[in-house]
A protein has these predicted regions:
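Catalytic loop of the DD-peptidase/beta-lactamase superfamily, centered on the K-T-G motif
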Residues: 1-48
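Canonical positions in the second alpha-helix
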Residues: 56, 93, 126-127
Length: 154
């Protein structure tokens, strides 16, 4: 499958990624465990995402959530303005993949988007411990620290 666009912005790319995911789901089907997880989170909300996942994993041992799948799902929710559900998915991703710098970087980004600078800084720092070459974390961390310094100095 090839999707093309004449626009080169993050929103168009994200929309195409969401469209591609929907096409793959429609073509290949969605595993029962993943269907159950999506339904449970829609019905109960995302606040207990980790607990819901753990319970459904017992009922559906085949349920597997890849790191990039959760990350893409979280960013999709974030693009839709659903910050709290995105936050809960990124927390789940950190829980499932604690050795991944990317999971902490993504969690930091959603904390930053919700205005929780302290948690963003903490998670960017954790990401940098795991991957010292993470330029995204370095740039965001510098901005957050500078903003905090300015606001503390006023």
């Amino acid at each position: 499958m090839v999707l093309l666009t004449n626009k080169n912005d993050g929103k168009t790319e994200a929309t195409l990624a969401d469209l591609a995911a929907a096409i793959v789901d429609a073509t290949d089907g969605v595993p029962a465990g993943l269907q159950a997880l999506r339904l449970a989170l829609q019905q109960r909300g995302f606040v207990q995402a980790a607990a819901v996942y753990a319970r459904l994993k017992q009922q559906h041992p085949e349920l597997y959530l890849a790191e990039d799948y959760i990350n893409n799902w979280g960013y999709s929710l974030l693009r839709q303005g659903q910050k709290q559900p995105a936050l809960e998915l990124f927390k789940l991703n950190v829980q499932l993949y604690p050795a991944s710098a990317n999971t902490y970087d993504s969690l930091a980004e959603v904390y930053e988007a919700t205005g929780d600078g302290d948690s963003a800084i903490q998670n960017y720092r954790r990401s940098l411990l795991l991957n010292p070459t993470n330029t995204n974390a370095t740039e965001h961390l510098q901005k957050l620290v500078a903003a905090g310094t300015k606001s503390n100095g006023n």
